């Protein structure tokens, strides 16, 4: 394997300082390129509530997979998988080293191991496709399959309505990926050496206090106005993944007079604490990972320096 075919993972719970540390690493090692592994940073306009790096840092450090979709769109794990593989290949091809940083643990897992199964069947979507889109006609259903997935349409007979419907359903459930493409992702393990680091709290109570302090800072920085502006875009459904994010969901309920201001703050902090516990549970079970405590971040920079020296 080519010596340069390796990359870094930097994982950790929310608010622990992953992004700022990643930017510091990028400053010290220009050879490194940053890729975000965060299911919310992909959305444009979700800035304050996601603690997104500022415009200057995003531009100067070429942070990948940030601000790539509109909040009215649904960005799935399959979208991420497809996008991140392209970014990794492009970075390695340019002779640089990818550093993937974030807290969306499912994304990291899928990237490492590929997909184990197709998206689960959804009876509501199946009925809607057949009744409303195809008007209960198998010819219309098959023509739709030919349009969205011509490869699968050549392998499935028009009279096999269940298989045709399943192939069409997969396209819609996956966020626009043909069945013939998804199959390629099955158990498709990442073909590069990965050095994995987990940034963990030295003191969880300190992290929880940091979360509270950060959210109050977000409120002072105009978070309410940010959510109000998003909500004023009438095409934005509160149930969309973008608007269902922690903080945005609670602020929307406050703006709709379903929460008091105090309830909004309390529920946001409570949900963030729950997310942190979930992320730390993932990390505890994560194989082949080097843990770095958040009060010893310089140790990570030293380790990366040694790895770069050994492998370049």
From Swiss-Prot:
- List the residues marked with site Interaction with substrate tRNA: 104, 126
Question: What GO terms describe the biological role, i.e. biological process, of this protein?
Answer: tRNA modification
Name the positions where ATP binds: 12-19
What residue spans carry the region label Interaction with substrate tRNA? Answer: 38-41, 162-166
Q: Which Pfam families match?
A: IPPT (PF01715)
Reaction(s) catalyzed by this protein?
adenosine(37) in tRNA + dimethylallyl diphosphate = N(6)-dimethylallyladenosine(37) in tRNA + diphosphate
In short, the EC number is: 2.5.1.75
Report residues binding substrate. Answer: 14-19
Q: What does this protein do?
A: Catalyzes the transfer of a dimethylallyl group onto the adenine at position 37 in tRNAs that read codons beginning with uridine, leading to the formation of N6-(dimethylallyl)adenosine (i(6)A).
Q: What is this protein called?
A: tRNA dimethylallyltransferase
Recorded source organism is: Buchnera aphidicola subsp. Cinara cedri (strain Cc)
């Amino acid at each position: 394997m080519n010596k340069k075919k390796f990359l870094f993972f930097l994982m950790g719970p929310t608010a622990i300082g992953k992004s700022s540390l990643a930017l510091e690493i990028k400053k010290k090692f220009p050879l490194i390129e940053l890729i975000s592994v965060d299911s919310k940073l992909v959305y444009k306009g979700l800035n304050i509530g996601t603690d997104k790096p500022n415009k200057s840092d995003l531009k100067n450090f070429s942070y990948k997979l940030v601000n790539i979709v509109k909040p009215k769109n649904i960005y799935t794990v399959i979208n991420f998988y497809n996008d991140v593989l392209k970014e990794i290949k492009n970075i390695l091809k340019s002779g640089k080293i990818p550093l993937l940083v974030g807290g969306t643990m499912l994304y990291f897992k899928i990237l490492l191991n590929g997909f184990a199964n197709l998206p689960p069947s959804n009876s509501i979507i199946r009925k809607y496709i057949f009744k409303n889109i195809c008007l209960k006609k198998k010819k219309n259903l098959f023509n739709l399959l030919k349009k969205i997935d011509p490869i699968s349409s050549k392998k499935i007979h028009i009279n096999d309505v269940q298989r045709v419907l399943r192939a069409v359903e997969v396209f819609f459930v996956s966020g626009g990926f043909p069945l013939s493409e998804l199959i390629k992702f099955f158990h498709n393990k990442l073909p590069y050496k990965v050095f994995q680091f987990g940034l963990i709290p030295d003191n969880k109570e300190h992290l929880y206090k940091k979360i509270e302090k950060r959210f109050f800072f977000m409120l002072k920085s105009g978070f309410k106005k940010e959510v109000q502006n998003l909500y004023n875009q009438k095409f934005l459904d509160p149930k969309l993944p973008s608007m269902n994010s922690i903080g945005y969901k609670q602020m929307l309920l406050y703006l709709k007079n379903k929460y008091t201001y105090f309830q909004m703050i309390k529920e946001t902090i409570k949900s963030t604490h729950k997310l942190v516990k979930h992320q730390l549970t993932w990390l505890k079970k994560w194989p082949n990972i080097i843990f770095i405590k958040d009060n010893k971040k310089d140790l990570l920079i030293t380790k990366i320096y040694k790895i770069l020296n050994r492998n370049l």
